[in-house]
Amino acid sequence: MQQQKTLISEAARPKMIAKTALLIVSNPNHIGKILPSLTKQVNKTLYIQLLSALSSPLGSFCPEIFNVWPKFTQTISGIYAQTLQFEDLDVRVLLSGLKYKNVEYIKTRQPIDLVVFDKCYPEDDITNFIKTRIPSITDSYSILLGDSGEFEEPTVDATRDYNVYKHSVLGGTFDRLHTAHKLLLTEAALRATEKVTVGVTVENMLGSKTLWELIEPLENRINGVKDFLEDINPEIIHNVVPISDMYGPAKDDPTMDVIVVSSETERGGVKVNEMRCKCGLQPLKIVTVDLINDPNPSPHEEIKVSSSTRRIRTLGKVIQAITPKAHLTEKPYIIGLTGGICSGKSGVGRRLAELGAYHIDCDKVAHFVYEPGKPAYNKIVETFGKEVVGENGEINRKEIGAIVFKDPKQLQKLNSIVWPAIVEEVQERIRKSNADVVVMEAAILLGAGWNKHCHEVWATVIPPDVALQRLQERNKLSLEDAKSRLAAQIDNKKYIEAANVVFYSLWDTETTKKQVDKAWELLLERIKCINT
């Protein structure tokens, strides 16, 4: 792709990375020739409008081929498939200008900073097109001209059913809206003349999914679906609702005509129809959308494009905005590392130490502050009596454990002595270290409120059943004792809610190591930005 140098005015040339771009496509089978350069010019949203020529009215793209809306499916799927390499870019193929012949403008919910054409047009045509057809254009917009090569006529699968209905329905989790979701939602919109209903699963249906704790909140997922549908086809009604079973409103809504499913969930469509028949309703026409393969699946990721894979790819990355803490100095940069029992904290801490961090294990610090002569030692003896002191003069941790774990008030007394002593010792070690990055590993980081001493919180999580098995094997515990220990800690979801970065140590050590290495590399980039 090259920037127009003679036809486009200096004011219209790209000056910076655009937030949102609109790509006018006349040759949809070959947009892959343009995308690599285009994605360097835009960082958030890419709208795509099919249009044979700038002078053509919207709704007239290859009319001899696309004489009914659903026939666009194959071409639109091909467009999305060509964008799979650029998963950080939110690509949206607009439908209004394809479905309706009376649409005058290309409407988008986001203002357009950059307009891209897949072939060269005269300057006057470009200027007139932008002024008259794109109402959401910004004042400081830029223009790029690309070359998608020789035109290849789109094709349509003659064996498919292309009927259109009043009311379509589909359901799913819709976590981290991705290309496969967009294909399903697009199919539902192309099939509907009046209304699309989307059921979005609530939390009680998510437990079996990989890294389900990282699934976006229901409200976010519902809003994501609404936003997409309102962008690509605002003319129809969008009814996006939570569902707590596999049927949702499809089981008893007589106005629905067609259900859109993936090839993986086709059986679900059959079950919905079985339920409708029990309710005395007509079965829905089932339209199946093929799964789309991920171009670069890694071990432990699914071959298909999926939300599970996208969640896995967030591991080691910032998942929650980092809030600056005015009371903390820029150096050292302190990471609070926490997580449940047997979740892999220590392994992550050791790897961070290998990479250059100063690693402080607060559990070992706790042992240190219990030692005779330390401030915590004297206070513990004063509070709990000499009976907690062993024959060797040291605190008998089992003895004091038997006291405090039966009585929350006694536990609170112990914590009020030990926790401040640990923090004081940790801070003293940090002062002496002169380190750039400190990792403060503590299972009780959140419960003790120590996250206030950290620039970021990193958490390790593991499925509860795996943690249970690891704990039994490591500590030689009975099933009941292991369950009791796990029940006493906060759950994975709370760790994730508090964390800026998350690790998942379910798989082999090398996979966890890669997560940590990625997190370290990104951390150094953040610190560099802070210091410049």
What are these regions (language model features)?
Residues 1-330, 464:
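Nucleotidyltransferase catalytic core that binds NTPs
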Residues 115, 196, 258, 359, ...:
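Short, well-ordered beta-strand core segments
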Residues 168, 325-364:
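Walker A (P-loop) phosphate-binding motif
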Residues 178, 259, 363, 414, ...:
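Residue-level signal for inorganic ion chemistry
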Residues 222, 377-381, 464-472, 479, ...:
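An amphipathic alpha-helix signature
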Residues 249-252, 423-432, 437-474:
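ATP-dependent NMP and nucleoside kinases share a basic, alpha-helical "lid"
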Residues 364-435:
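ATP-dependent small-molecule kinase phosphotransfer cores
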Residues 425, 434, 451-453, 473-532:
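Small-molecule kinase domains that catalyze NTP-dependent phosphoryl transfer to phosphate-bearing small molecules
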